[in-house]
């Protein structure tokens, strides 16, 4: 559905933000896109949406070239930016103006999402609302577009804890086999139990792109056990609750993915983790 092939992008001639990037996003998945600030996560989403253009390489989105900004492509992509545009419209007027750009837009689903987010009236003026309330409205609208590709940049910024739970439930229910949802965030805890594929960027490159099932098949997440010496330790982190470890899963044990721990392990020991995944892929 989305294919990056040897993509280069830079905002200046001196520093490349993305270099020789190869990456694919397939439908039927909620992809988590993680990376430190400045890695190029937002840029990657904007390239997919046709808001930025690569300087080198080939990028295809639903068999379209995003830089051409074909209407047939744009009506099936919704991009939710981190910084929300300023709107003075009421919610009802916002729907009236923007929904026609998306042929599969569901007014019923929009209403359901607003209700879930506890937004009681479409008469509210958007410029009178808090940042969190605006974010809820734009998220609800994005889900209601029912586009094949839904791009979300830091969608949980501004949401309180109950609203984050509502967000996860709605996004999970919005996924189907034909839809590709990509969520970029640095708040990794917000993606727990939601994503089924994880992409981690480091040094402006793809450090990891694997399903959650594959990650937990090859890596073991555990609290340190002094009596166990069987699993090679890749990364350790001291916390008030003990020493948490990422190990090579040599015995095929079950464990729950800790996204934050994995992210820190990638930053600290990327080559060793990549070797585990590449080696086991080659053996298959």
Feature map (PLM): residue ranges:
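Conserved ABC transporter NBD signature motif
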Residues: 57-68, 72-73
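A short, flexible loop at the N-terminus of ABC-type nucleotide-binding domains that lies
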Residues: 1-21, 27
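ABC-family P-loop ATPase nucleotide-binding domains
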Residues: 79-137
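ABC transporter nucleotide-binding domain
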Residues: 167-182, 186-247
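Catalytic Walker B motif of ABC-type/P-loop ATPase nucleotide-binding domains
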Residues: 150-154
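The feature captures the beta-strand-to-loop junction immediately N-terminal to the Walker
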Residues: 34-36
